Amino acid sequence: MKNNSIKTVVATGIGAALFVVIGHLINIPTFVPNTSIQLQYAVQSLLAVVFGPVVGFLVGFIGHTLKDSLTYGPWWSWILASGVFGLVVGLTKKRLRIQEGIFEGKDILFFNLVQIAANVLAWGVIAPVLDILIYSEAANKVFAQGLVAGIANSITIAIAGTLLLVVYAKSQTKTGSLSKD
C-alpha cells in the first residue's frame, strides 16, 4: 500500500504541474468568451487511465486550482468539473489493459466513449449548473461555454489523449512477450 501512496502523490504532483504549465502555454481562444481550447486534459486523461480515478481527480482539481490562482482567481465550478472529469476517466483503469501494453481498437473506442461522456458530464452539466448556482451566471452564457469546452476537450483528447495512451502502451512490456532462451 505504501508504494501505491507514493505513486499517487508523485503522479498527482507531476500531473498538477503539467496541467498548470500546459494550460498556460497552450491556450487557444474560441469565439465564446472565457472559453479556450486546452491540451492539458489529454495529459490528465493519460494519468487518470494509468494511475486511476483518485489521481485523475486530484490532477484536475489541484492543477485547475493552481492554474486559475495564477491568473484571475479560482473558478470553483470549473475546478470541480476538471476533477470529476479525471475521476470518471480514471474509472477505466481496471477495464483498459494499458499496463500490459495493450491498447487496441476496441480499447481506443471504449476510452473515447468514456472521455466524451465525462466531458458531457463535466462541461455540459457540472460546470454550467454550478456557475448558475454559485455565481448567478446567465444560463445561456454558461451552457454555451460548457458546450464549446466539452466539444473542444473531446476532440483534443480523442487525438492527443489517444496518441499519448498508444505511445504509453507501446512502452509497456506485453504480458507473455518475454520468453526464456
UniProtKB/Swiss-Prot annotation:
Q: What is this protein called?
A: UPF0397 protein SSU05_0404
| Alphabetic keyword roster | Cell membrane, Membrane, Transmembrane, Transmembrane helix
One Pfam short name: ECF-ribofla_trS
Taxonomic lineage from the root: Bacteria, Bacillati, Bacillota, Bacilli, Lactobacillales
UniProt xrefs under PANTHER family:
UPF0397 PROTEIN BC_2624-RELATED (PTHR37815), UPF0397 PROTEIN SPR0429 (PTHR37815:SF3)
Primary localisation category: membrane
* GO (cellular component) term, any one: plasma membrane
Does the record bear Transmembrane helix in its keywords?
yes
InterPro entries referenced in this protein's UniProt entry, alphabetically = ECF_substrate-spec-like (IPR009825), UPF0397 (IPR022914)
Sequence intervals crossing the membrane: 9-29, 46-66, 70-90, 108-128, 147-167
Gene3D superfamilies for the chain: 1.10.1760.20
Q: How does it sit in the membrane?
A: Multi-pass membrane protein
Family, per entry: Belongs to the UPF0397 family.
The protein's location, in the record's own words, is: Cell membrane
